[in-house]
Amino acid sequence: MTTMAIVGAGPGLGAAVARRFGTEGFGVALIARSQERVDALAAELADDGVTARCFSADVRELPTLTAALESAAETLGPIEVLQYSPIPQKDFMLPLLETGPADLVGPIEFSIYGPVAAVQHV
């Protein structure tokens, strides 16, 4: 079975992509901070015949992200397709003239370190 992982899986884009790929025969790894959210999404997808498994990770804590991707590959098989689409926190969105270097740590972890770690792991 071909496997895809959705990092930042949620009820919008993540659910639509999971449903589309899942109905084409892909195994789907749903990865998000909230285990409850991905569990609910997997149950919904199962009703559509999609094989989805859930993993909890915070993209700003790289060991949790790589552990989730490792578990997904062990459970569903090698990950061949990756979608990275978590929603940024609202406090990341500051006016440029009010943004200092320390304000960029979270957004950089989220927008650069997370996707790079995910791509390298897959």
Language-model segments: which ranges?
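Hydrophobic positions on the long internal alpha-helix
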Residues: A68, Q83, G114-V122
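Aromatic pocket-lining residues of Rossmann-like dinucleotide-binding sites
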Residues: F21
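Conserved glycine-rich Rossmann-like NAD(P)H-binding loop of the short-chain dehydrogenase/reductase
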Residues: F26-A40
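Conserved alpha-helical elements of the SDR catalytic core
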Residues: V17, A72, H121-V122
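Conserved glycine-rich cofactor-binding loop
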Residues: G10-G12
